[in-house]
From Swiss-Prot:
InterPro entries: Cyt_b/b6_C, Cyt_b/b6_C_sf, Cyt_b/b6_N, Cytb/b6-like_sf, Cytochrome_b, Cytochrome_b_C_euk/bac, Cytochrome_b_N_euk/bac, Di-haem_cyt_TM. This is Cytochrome b. Keywords: Electron transport, Heme, Iron, Membrane, Metal-binding, Mitochondrion, Mitochondrion inner membrane, Respiratory chain, Transmembrane, Transmembrane helix, Transport, Ubiquinone. A ubiquinone binds at H201.
Length: 379
């Protein structure tokens, strides 16, 4: 008798996605991050749901409602810090997942990659709006600075900003709509992640060698389910360690001060996972130019498949491209550091050079190096 999982309409979908899915036999731990991102999303939705039960999206009570969650709600402090640090874990997994895609040429699956870029934008938008909700100093001023960037759009800019604010400044209307969007976006992200998987399963997974693995496939369960569970356990260990030992390590002390429109903090900066983009934004003295550079710093990922000039898919056997890849990683770490520094002498020029190098590596140096490597192999 055929298994129920192969005949039942719902079980059939689960079976073909997570049980009998033919998977390359040689995918490494770098392929674990997809499932880890799924776990992160579930954790964020669940903790967010419980936080929303106690949070009030009103400028007068938002800050005190977060304080109430931490002090009076049963395990409220745990839920709040799991949610805040869960976002950091989410972005760590995201960056590693994208890095894996770049290194092993997974971007050649065009639909999967483009939906991934869309997901990255959606997660960044969600995280930004979530950072505004506690209504601390950095929440308020971060919202003011980032939404104000839209005023750089010619002709409609200032109207657009006031439309987003729901008034003439960041106020009650802004907070309420940010809460509404912050609540709904994770469900849109979950739906997009489903489409992401749908397109991935059309082609099957890539593997470290970048070669076709059609001749050597194994079922996803039990091999990769066990492997994914190990990854999940390590993620939970890292997250709980962070939450229970140093929950404020990645936060900003300014956000423990209630929002005050009359007092600007000395250094306005976003959460650590946006610092690289923030550094690119600040490296251009012109407002519109900075906004375009900020958007392009993420959108450039969508161009990468069209700049693939190598005859090989993966970087596994391309040492020169590997060198450039790790220079790109170092450059992003440099940008992250610069984004958290004040705008003064050594940091300005370092940020500008790192920003130029970022675009130069992706758009020019990597494609040229790939062509050079083709010639080395007489292809």
């Amino acid at each position: 008798m055929t298994h129920l999982r192969k005949t039942h309409p719902l079980m059939k979908i689960i079976n073909s996605s997570f049980i009998d899915l033919p998977t390359p036999s040689n995918i490494s731990s770098w392929w674990n991050f997809g499932s880890l991102l799924g776990v992160c999303l579930v954790v964020q939705i669940l903790t967010g749901l419980f936080l929303a039960m106690h949070y009030t999206s009103d400028t007068m009570t938002a800050f005190s409602s977060v304080t109430h969650i931490c002090r009076d709600v049963n395990y409220g402090w745990l839920i709040r810090y799991l949610h805040a640090n869960g976002a950091s874990m989410f972005f760590i997994c995201l960056f590693l997942h994208v890095g894996r895609g770049l290194y092993y040429g997974s971007y050649m699956f065009l639909e999967t990659w483009n939906i991934g870029v869309l997901l990255l934008f959606a997660v960044m938008a969600t995280a930004f709006m979530g950072y505004v909700l506690p209504w601390g100093q950095m929440s308020f001023w971060g919202a003011t600075v980032i939404t104000n960037l839209l005023s750089a759009i010619p002709y409609i800019g200032s109207d657009l900003v006031e439309w987003i604010w729901g008034g003439f400044s960041v106020d009650k209307a802004t907070l309420t709509r940010f809460f509404a969007f912050h609540f709904i976006l994770p469900f849109i992200i979950a739906a997009l992640a489903g489409v992401h998987l749908l397109f991935l399963h059309e082609t099957g997974s890539n593997n470290p060698s970048g070669l076709s693995s059609d001749a050597d496939k194994i079922p996803f369960h039990p091999y990769y389910t066990i492997k994914d569970i190990l990854g999940v356990l390590l993620l939970i260990l890292a997250l709980t360690s962070l939450v229970l030992f140093s929950p404020d390590l990645l936060g900003d002390p300014d956000n423990y001060t209630p929002a005050n429109p009359l007092n600007t903090p000395p250094h306005i900066k976003p959460e650590w996972y946006f610092l690289f983009a923030y550094a690119i934004l600040r490296s251009i003295p012109n407002k519109l130019g900075g906004v375009l550079a900020l958007i392009l710093s993420i959108l450039v990922l969508a161009v990468i498949p069209f700049l693939h000039t190598s005859k090989q898919r993966s970087m596994m056997f391309r040492p020169f491209s590997q060198c450039l890849f790790w220079i790109l990683v170092a450059d992003l770490l440099t940008l992250t550091w610069i984004g958290g520094q004040p705008v003064e002498h050594p940091f300005i020029i370092i940020g500008q050079l790192a920003s130029i190098l970022y675009f130069l590596l992706i758009l020019v140096l990597m494609p040229i190096t790939s062509l050079f490597e083709n010639n080395l192999l007489k292809w």
